[in-house]
């Protein structure tokens, strides 16, 4: 009888694992934001900073991401933007927020003559406010919409 129950439950187990498994290795939007935009320990001061970081953070796999911004502040300062002034996102959604103060950022822009797999970036440092889209519970940044 124990074997019969096991054989009856086996298809159910396979179904549950089939539904759960695809999400196991998936990067959340908040984790992707951190990977693509956070560098709290860095300064972005080297001319090769963007080339190194874009490769290290997997934004040159298969193609060159044209533009990216790294934030050189504690993650808590960036999370704090989600409780600041609400602004409309570039895509028209209403879940964007502007940081209350300027943050140290590095903009990486693909140079005009650069092509995959030799992605070559211009590195520029600024002190600017950032606009982030926030989602979830807890409410955290999931997209860097702009720097102003």
Swiss-Prot record:
Pancreas. Residues 1-25 form the signal peptide. It comes from the Eukaryota. It holds the Pfam family RnaseA. It catalyses: an [RNA] containing cytidine + H2O = an [RNA]-3'-cytidine-3'-phosphate + a 5'-hydroxy-ribonucleotide-3'-[RNA]; an [RNA] containing uridine + H2O = an [RNA]-3'-uridine-3'-phosphate + a 5'-hydroxy-ribonucleotide-3'-[RNA]. Disulfide bonds join 50-108, 64-119, 82-134, 89-96. Keywords: Disulfide bond, Endonuclease, Hydrolase, Lyase, Nuclease, Secreted, Signal. GO terms for biological process: defense response to Gram-positive bacterium. The keyword Hydrolase applies. Substrate binds at residues 32, 35, 65-69, 90, 109. It is found in: Secreted. Coiled coil: none annotated. Its EC number is 4.6.1.18. GO terms for molecular function: lyase activity; nucleic acid binding; ribonuclease A activity. Its main location: secreted. The active site is at residues 37, 143. Endonuclease that catalyzes the cleavage of RNA on the 3' side of pyrimidine nucleotides. Acts on single-stranded and double-stranded RNA. Belongs to the pancreatic ribonuclease family. This is Ribonuclease pancreatic. The lineage of its organism: Eukaryota, Metazoa, Chordata, Craniata, Vertebrata.
